[in-house]
Amino acid sequence: QHTLSVTRLCEYYCKAYPLLKKDLLITAAICHDIGKTKEISLFPENDYTDDGQFLGHIVIGVEMVGEKIRQIPGFPAVLANELKHCILAHHGEYEFGSPKKPAIMEAVALNFADNTDAKLQTFTEIMENTTETGWLGFNRLFDSNLKGTRME
């Protein structure tokens, strides 16, 4: 669900900001978390793999995408680097596990879409798990005291 939501946000960004390379951004959105398929083991184990512990999903994902790119004859080197950069930079900041900060417009857009979906989905889950309105208390992810609101 997260990857689909990120991709939809990126589609919107492409309409709102025509300078974005749509093919690059949509491909990056689809591939940005592909490394999680090797970072975490399957159910019922559902725990970090050795590769997941050592490398993390971002590095694993760049390696997976790089392997596929090498199988495509004549794939443009600049485009390959741009796609890999988007994946490497999708967490946006070093302190959030990003090996690189976004350096191209598509990487910025992907970071915003990923962050927006993660935070709004988390807030949605908080709201779905409470019947309270008013102040809900401090939340570390948001670094803020959250307030529950409902449609009247």
Predicted regions: what is each one?
Residues 1-8, 34:
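All-alpha helical catalytic cores of prenyl diphosphate-utilizing isoprenoid enzymes
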Residues 12-129:
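Divalent metal-dependent catalytic cores for phosphoryl transfer on phosphate-bearing substrates
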Residues 111, 128, 137-140, 151-152:
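N-terminal intrinsically disordered, cationic/polar leader segments
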Residues 117, 135-138, 146:
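C-terminal membrane module of polytopic membrane proteins
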Residues 131-133:
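C-terminal functional modules
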